Amino acid sequence: MTESTQAALRAAGLDPAQVRRVIENALVEDLGPDFLDVTSVATIPAEQSDTADLVARADGVLAGLAVATAVFELVGEVSGFGRTVEVSELARDGERVARGDVLATVTGPTRLLLTAERTALNLLCRMSGVATHTRAWADALAGTKAMVLDTRKTTPGLRALEKYAVRAGGGTNKRMGLYDVAMIKDNHKLAAGSITAAYRRVREAFPEVPVQVEVTTVAEAVEAVEAGADFLLCDNMTPEVLAEAVAAVGDRAELEATGGLTLEVAGRYAATGVDFLSVGALTHSSPILDIALDLRSE
């Protein structure tokens, strides 16, 4: 992986070493332990080189070009081609793209291009799909104080990439995992005996960790904020009940709505004055953005 690609990943808030591990695992899935693309080896001379275009097949929002570039570079590193691949980006992450737009050109050994193609596209299409879906939510909330948040409902192994795609689409990350924010949910409350008891146990064990509490009623919201919670996750509240919770809590904590949210009702929930709308579908149900790799004909 080149220094410029690593720098681009860092600028996106991604760890190059982590991205490398993701790509290497994906390549092993596709190429097997011997790192072999039998079709390309059989049909394409080793010395042949070509240029290919990454082309959008649908309108959307782009995310993951640096990750796709890293795929081509890593295939070149480990495949023994002995020649470098050059990627020229013609669009940027976070930009809207239209069907037919050329997003980047890739030049290098033809075998390398086709061997890397599917892994590069799988990641690029997935990330761009998440960014596209997120942008629809961000647009739906435009003009309100509410922001759209992702969740931990991510594809195993791809959380960092998918959460970056949410950011590229105009969304916000709340927590990366179980380690950076405490989330007291219904099972924790049952185990501890009450919201207040659960909060106190978390605060005693981890004094510096932010604490969020899941609540389903206005009374629970008041109990949680009086206990000291930093954030409230208001689960499956109607807009009317949520507005009551917002009024009861005031500025003592940030409130996040979740549960059954759709683009059609986003405006109603945002109008309550809630700070965030938490949408698991950003990462667990976003369709891909169709992108293809087209070899240029001579």
Show the residue positions of the predicted features.
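Acidic/glycine-rich phosphate/pyrophosphate-binding loops and surrounding catalytic core
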Residues: 2-227, 240-248, 254-256, 263, ...
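Short secondary-structure boundary segments
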Residues: 236, 259, 281
